Amino acid sequence: LSEIIDTKKIGDSQIIVTDGSRNDVDPFFLKKDYFKSFIRKQEEKVFIDSQMVVGCSCLEYDKLFTLQNQPLLNVGDRILYQNVGAYTMTLSPLFIRFFPRVYLKTLNGYEIIREEWTVNDLKQ
């Protein structure tokens, strides 16, 4: 689960920045798209030709996927990824940011089973 933290329009392109990274969902950097769904704060009626969804690392390989002719994603909207993350606990580097929260899907929804790391966790 990642959240949209910023959007930028650059020329004809719409860049959508998430608080997640490709390290979180594809540590081998092989996939071009993911099984995903969107949790929107409000229904968007404006469709955008192309939206490039990128991670928070600002590295050129941190491009997650591109949406074509889809409703505009806005700050606060969330992306729920499915069938990813099996190796991210062991392969994600502590580069640029600490380990993210880990959620467990339960019968009643989602439960946080590990909070995002802080400096104190790194010093253990």
Name every feature range the model reports, one short phrase each.
Residues 1-124:
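Charged (often Lys/Glu-rich) extended helix/loop segments that serve as interaction or gating elements
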